[in-house]
């Protein structure tokens, strides 16, 4: 029987970007937007705070966009500092690339295994689904979900008792399945 695990964000990830005031490279999203108007053109930034010194930095969301080109719902969400919009924009790879930033997902995700009653079977088939594109090592997920050490998961992988259609040695952010034979 195929069991299903879900990797879900537990909170907003930290933003990796160098602080201009201190040597820290971690910022947390404040959840606030700065909307600035130049006649009919808008600039929009997502404000982030340095975790070390508290300095505010801006991540560019929109630059010199005509007000009429924006959907009114988006403008309302920006003015209301919508937390869901903050999460959406932080997952946008184009915005991150434009701002030369990356995300640090350490401690910002959780694994929902649906219970541990399936772990005592001889053969376990599991489908892992990602609710958001969180780059994680499958070995770490399997170790956490099965209650094993990562070294033990690596050993099972080397012995051929842990098999998958995808490579389990790098980072993944997409759905995959695996079979564990004990």
Ranges and model annotations:
Residues 1-84:
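N-terminal cysteine/histidine-rich coordination modules
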Residues 7-14, 20-21, 122-125, 136-143:
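A broad, low-specificity signal for short, low-complexity segments enriched in glycine/proline
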Residues 10, 41, 117-119, 169-171:
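Sterically constrained small-residue positions within well-ordered secondary structures
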Residues 43-45, 123-125, 175:
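A generic structural signal for beta-strand entry/edge sites
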Residues 51, 127, 179:
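Residues in well-ordered beta-strands of folded domains
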Residues 63-130, 134-135:
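Extended interfacial segments that mediate partner engagement and assembly in macromolecular machines
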Residues 116-117, 179-182:
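A cross-kingdom feature marking charged/low-complexity
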Residues 130-178:
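A basic, amphipathic helix-loop patch mediating RNA/tRNA/ribosome contacts
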